[in-house]
């Protein structure tokens, strides 16, 4: 992808590497970023945009401290990657300086393609394209700006580079992404049970046949890590109130899109209006260069500012949903073990329509029926390899005496019914 005119020209050069830039992080302390390519990435507007995107979307509705950003998370993941590289090199794993810089650059940019409220809007404003795909598009754009200096980083990120363990440090069961967000999200939410021993896990990492493994001494830390992930998902990431609040947001944007399609005037920033006015998917991104330019302008503030105007919109449904978002009037939520009966859904449609004096066919905007399923460990998808004292490699499911792998591998399915509260 070519640089869009001179848009990033001022950011395409950076000072040669001298002393490191030091950033004080509340989770890991001082994080050192070498001047040069890596600090050039941090200073780039596409990376700075992450300062305006919440790491946990709308989780602050339950955990008021959870207002940390994708920017902070990316710096934390970079710090852990730096620690992992040093640890592996001390064990005799040969990593060229260029490879070390490439994997550090890749982890810095791994989340650069996230949209407003992180994962919440991935299937609302856009569909059929993941934030990883958009991250890659943005990496290629920055790479053009930096005259190809990110070629190796992009190769590692995509998993094309021969040393597979470098890609695993970015994306696997034990990547630096997960090790940071579990520690960081635990810190900011105050859910202390989620605090993992990331330092020990990193010290126990090793490489066999270009594959990331964990020394047997680290098995207890891994058991705690997998158990912690399970707790954090159901206690934080999939908390019933967070899910309900997210559904209000999704329904509000869906209503705004439908109103625009019907020819009504709906206020939005130019970048937000672009995505509300078009059905943007992977094919659209490939055919319309302006899609990426508009996406790069989007952050949480576009949505919040639109809500403040939509609260006074003449459309009762849009104004109700915007008011719900701003005033924390969250959908009532029910969690069931079995699918929600159609009769229950139809009954709620009628009740909502009567309550708000709207057509029954529009009542679906004020409710949501969804299924959420999650497992914490799947041997077939991405296993964790344990290196024993004899040099043999086994999966943690076989090496652990305490870990209930059957429980962690079981896909838990819950059925959520969220709907507008009645007066």
Predicted regions span which residues?
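Short alpha-helical catalytic segment bearing the HExxH-like zincin motif
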Residues: 103-108
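Histidine-centered, transition-metal-coordinating active-site segments
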Residues: 11-102, 116-122, 126-423
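Short active-site segment of divalent metal-dependent hydrolases/proteases
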Residues: 109, 113-114
């Amino acid at each position: 992808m070519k640089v869009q005119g001179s848009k990033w020209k001022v950011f395409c050069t950076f000072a040669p590497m001298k002393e490191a830039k030091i950033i004080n992080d509340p989770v890991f302390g001082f994080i050192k970023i070498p001047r040069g390519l890596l600090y050039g990435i941090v200073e780039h507007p596409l990376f700075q945009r992450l300062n305006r995107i919440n790491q946990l979307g709308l989780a602050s509705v339950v955990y008021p401290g959870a207002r940390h950003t994708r920017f902070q998370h990316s710096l934390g993941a970079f710090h852990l990657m730096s620690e992992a590289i040093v640890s592996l090199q001390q064990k005799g794993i040969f990593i060229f300086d260029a490879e070390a810089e490439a994997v550090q650059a890749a982890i810095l940019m791994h989340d650069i393609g996230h949209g407003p409220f992180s994962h919440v809007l991935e299937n609302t404003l856009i569909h059929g394209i993941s934030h990883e795909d958009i991250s890659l598009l943005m990496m290629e754009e920055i790479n053009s700006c930096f005259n190809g200096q990110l070629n190796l980083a992009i190769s590692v990120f995509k998993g094309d580079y021969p040393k597979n363990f470098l890609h695993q440090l970015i994306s696997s069961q034990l990547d630096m992404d997960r090790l940071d967000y579990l520690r960081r999200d635990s810190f900011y939410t105050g859910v202390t049970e989620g605090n993992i021993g990331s330092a020990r896990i990193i010290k126990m990492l090793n490489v066999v046949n270009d594959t990331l493994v964990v020394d047997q001494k680290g098995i207890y830390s891994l058991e705690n890590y997998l158990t912690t992930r399970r707790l954090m998902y159901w206690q934080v990431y999939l908390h019933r109130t967070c899910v309900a609040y997210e559904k209000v947001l999704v329904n509000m944007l869906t209503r705004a899109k439908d109103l625009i399609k019907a020819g009504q005037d709906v206020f939005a920033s130019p970048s937000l209006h672009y995505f509300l006015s078009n059905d943007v998917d992977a094919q659209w991104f490939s055919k319309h260069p302006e899609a990426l330019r508009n996406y790069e302008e989007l952050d949480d503030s576009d949505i919040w500012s639109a809500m403040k105007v939509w609260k006074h919109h003449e459309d009762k449904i849009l104004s109700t949903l915007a008011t719900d978002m701003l005033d924390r009037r969250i959908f009532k939520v029910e969690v069931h073990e079995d699918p929600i009966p159609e009769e229950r859904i139809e009954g709620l449609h009628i009740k909502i329509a009567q309550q708000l004096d709207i057509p029954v066919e529009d009542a679906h905007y004020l409710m949501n029926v969804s299924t959420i399923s999650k497992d914490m460990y799947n041997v077939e998808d991405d296993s964790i390899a344990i290196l024993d004292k004899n040099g043999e490699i086994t999966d943690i499911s076989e090496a652990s005496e305490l870990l209930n792998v059957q429980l962690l591998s079981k896909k838990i399915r819950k059925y959520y019914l969220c709907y507008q509260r009645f007066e």
